[in-house]
């Protein structure tokens, strides 16, 4: 799968970089869109992340990249929030028919450079806030580093029985305009796309009812469940469904388990949550309802069939006095028997799994 994917992208003029960390993890980096398109365990050709089926052949990839639609290659991407400010040109009209992904953001104009520690992606862009009626010039940088198996010293986990891949992602957002307070409120937004038909877990410090952004109307009653320390979201329904959890409640981890052949895979995102920060993303119809750090979106529609784990970084710009913010997170991915994967999930996420 890895070699075929690289060959297909090369054939349609999309350059890639295959970066290997010290533990043998391989990351397929696609500058077009600033994506970490693939995460591969040592010796494995199977991607832990979702890629668009249009990339399965040169012919379909050529057609896809020639279209005027938003081109979602897949993998892990970085956007900016609040969504309602930057993705709705006709605000306050927030009808989904008017939704528009700013092309300066995605695919953007990312440049890849090699550093002493690995690779770095940089995108400079101008973007308009349709709600704030302010424009801002930004710089987004992304670089990767190793992330050793967090359970490598845990004797209770059968390390040799599983495949592991992981990396650290260092992302920065910088306002290039002279006065950051003249800029709109803007924050980093991380979105990781994974194969559909799995179950997502958000550990919490106490019981909470997730905010439903859209969907989850005619879905089975067990699709979304909460307990004292965990939110569970089965991502298998048709359509698009999204939830969010406030920063003060979340632990800074999200996990997702999905079947793959006769095995199961677990992906965990480990990130820093600062409840004192200004989490700017809001539900589309309630633009003052702030404070959500952690989100999840199930997509089974014309955009593809994938599950997203999402997190936000406190905003900079208007009213904050901040010009720059740097975020550091880890992605840990495991593949093995269902028993082993659930044991790892209980260790890293919640005993309730």
Protein language model annotation of sequence segments:
Residues 1-166, 172, 176-230, 238-353:
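Surface-exposed acidic/polar loop and edge beta-strand patches at domain peripheries
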């Amino acid at each position: 799968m890895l070699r075929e994917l690289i060959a297909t992208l090369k054939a349609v003029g999309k350059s890639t970089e295959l970066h290997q960390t010290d533990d043998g993890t391989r990351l397929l980096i696609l500058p077009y869109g600033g994506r970490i398109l693939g995460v591969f365990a040592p010796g494995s050709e199977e991607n832990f992340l979702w890629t668009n089926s249009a990339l399965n052949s040169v012919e379909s990839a050529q057609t896809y990249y020639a279209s005027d639609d938003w081109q979602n290659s897949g993998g892990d991407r970085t956007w900016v929030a609040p969504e309602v400010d930057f993705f709705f040109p006709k605000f306050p009209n927030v009808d989904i028919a008017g939704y528009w992904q700013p092309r300066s953001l995605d695919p953007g104009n990312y440049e890849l450079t090699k550093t002493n520690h690995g690779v770095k992606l940089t995108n400079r862009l101008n973007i308009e806030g349709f709600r704030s009626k302010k424009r801002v010039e930004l710089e987004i940088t992304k670089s990767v580093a190793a992330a050793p198996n967090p359970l490598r010293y845990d004797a209770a986990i059968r390390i040799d029985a599983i495949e592991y891949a992981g990396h650290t992602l260092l992302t920065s957002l910088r306002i290039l305009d002279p006065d950051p307070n003249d800029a709109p409120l803007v924050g980093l937004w991380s979105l990781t796309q994974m194969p559909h038909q799995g179950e997502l877990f958000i550990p919490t410090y106490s019981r909470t009812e997730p905010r439903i952004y859209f969907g989850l109307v005619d879905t089975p009653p067990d699709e979304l469940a909460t307990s004292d320390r965990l939110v569970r979201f089965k991502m298998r329904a048709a359509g698009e469904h999204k939830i969010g959890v406030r920063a003060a409640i979340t632990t800074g981890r999200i996990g997702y388990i999905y079947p793959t052949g006769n095995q199961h895979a677990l992906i965990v995102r480990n990130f820093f949550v600062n409840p004192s920060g200004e989490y700017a993303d809001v539900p589309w119809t309630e633009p003052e309802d702030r404070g959500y750090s952690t989100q999840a979106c199930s997509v089974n529609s014309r955009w593809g069939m994938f599950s997203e784990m999402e997190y936000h970084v406190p905003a900079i710009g208007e009213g904050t006095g901040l010009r720059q913010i740097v975020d550091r997170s880890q992605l840990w991915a495991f593949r093995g028997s269902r028993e082993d994967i659930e044991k790892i999930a209980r260790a890293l996420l919640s005993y309730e799994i």
